[in-house]
Regions:
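Short, Lys/Arg-enriched charge-dense amphipathic segments
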Residues: 23-24, 53-54, 84
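Extracellular "spike/adhesin" assembly and maturation modules
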Residues: 1-50
Length: 317
């Protein structure tokens, strides 16, 4: 007697031994095939049940806001291997196929940028699907768990207005320029190959010959291949921005909803808590820009303040 080797395969049919069949012996003998079919089914159902248990645990962790996320390059290593071990080509293919099975808010893809470890977390899945003046397709927006370890002033001069080139403050600020040149150029080539521009309806604040203290309108803009979220995308409401114009289109990213867990970010991967910039500018003032404090509060700092950080944020779709 020996043991049957089980495989997690669903057998559509279970062999029926007929009168006159030669029974024989060994793993491929007729006498053993029926048991083999049933054993395979049992192993298949066990694998499915184990996966369901794990998914339920993850769901409850998410409901309790204690889900830390999983490394997708480990969780889906076998799938990624079929894309020449390129996780970015793999996630792009998943998005194109609208196959989000096993992908959860907070899960991440790790990579190196300028010699620094970055964990790009899933912040939202199809958060802006079909929105905007130009219809947005299927996408995933990623926001790094912690900030890039080099601080960047939001502006080189202490002003939060747009200018004659573009009335939207974000579009002409120093932070947008730095992250879309220096930072972007430090990204791995396979990641750059998959990033697309994020388009958004963002506030405008500019009048020739004047310095404005409130935003007076909004306009559609391609806000960059790298960007930072708005106040509304982090907090789900306006705290310091101009009422109306600063958050007309924003949806709160699920990763920030109902918890401060992911609003609080460190200086580099796992580093000390830090303050970090948002896209929105302050209402009622010509120098402040909205931010997140190192304790997670909705905050603001002078646009030229030099020791505020930013996460690495991008869209694949």
């Amino acid at each position: 007697m020996g043991n049957i080797t089980e495989s997690p395969v669903w057998e559509d049919n279970v062999l029926q031994i007929e009168v006159g069949d030669s029974v024989g012996g060994g793993p491929l003998a007729v006498a053993n095939l029926q048991a083999q079919d049933l054993a395979n089914r049992t192993q298949y159902l066990k694998a499915k049940a184990d996966t369901a248990d794990k998914n339920i645990d993850d769901l409850f962790n998410d409901m309790n806001r204690i889900y830390n996320g999983q490394d997708l390059t480990t969780k889906f290593a076998d799938e990624i291997a079929t894309y020449s071990d390129d996780p970015w080509a793999w996630i792009k293919a998943r998005i194109t196929a609208v196959d989000y099975g096993g992908l959860n808010i907070g899960d991440y893809i790790p990579f190196s940028m300028g010699g620094n470890a970055i964990k790009a977390q899933i912040a939202g899945i199809d958060t802006y699907y079909r929105a905007n003046d130009v219809e947005t397709g299927h996408h995933i927006d990623f926001i790094s768990k912690d900030c890039y370890p080099t601080p960047v002033p939001w502006n080189t001069t202490n002003i939060n207005n747009g200018n004659a080139t573009n009335a939207a403050p974000w579009m002409v600020c120093n932070l947008k320029n730095v992250i879309n040149t220096t930072w972007y150029n430090s990204l791995p080539a396979p990641l750059k190959a998959q990033i697309i521009e994020k388009r958004a309806y963002i506030e405008t604040r500019y009048t020739s010959g004047s310095t404005l203290t409130d935003s007076t309108g909004a306009a559609w803009n391609d806000i960059g291949k790298l960007w930072v979220p708005s106040e509304g995308e982090v907090y789900g409401t306006v705290h310091w921005g101009t009422k109306g114009y600063s958050s007309m289109q924003n949806a709160e990213y699920p990763i920030f909803a109902a918890s401060w867990r992911n609003r609080i970010k460190g200086i580099g991967d796992g580093g000390a808590r830090c303050r970090w910039w948002l896209l929105s500018v302050y209402g009622g003032n010509s120098t402040y820009v909205c931010s997140v404090s190192h304790g997670g509060l909705a905050d603001y700092y002078d646009a030229s303040f030099a020791t505020v950080y930013a996460p690495v944020c991008f869209r694949i779709g």
